[in-house]
Amino acid sequence: MKILSLNVRGLGGLAKQKSLQRIFASLSPDIILLQETMNSTYPALLAFSKIHPGWEFCALSSNGLSGGILSGWNPLHVKCKAFRTFAGILLKSRFRGSTTSLSILNCCGPYLHRESF
């Protein structure tokens, strides 16, 4: 079981997509959790489907130029049910061949108190 979580700071550029494709190929994750996609839902899903054809995924749009969340999983290795929540995307997961279930929350919050530091 491999779960990869990344703050990608945008999915729009071709160079970023190719870089992510290399990372995903080298690590072979079963579940990918991306934060700060900085995209509305459709472009994020389109970019991810190019990187990982055949995967299933769920996305939440960004709020302007910040935020955006995408969760993806390989249906050959894991069965997931995705729920959009106020806090992010909740995945109820079970890896194939296992009876153990796993709940994963993919969330991203803005840094609200940066002036304090």
Residue ranges, per PLM feature:
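A shared catalytic/ligand-binding motif for oxyanion handling
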Residues: 1-117
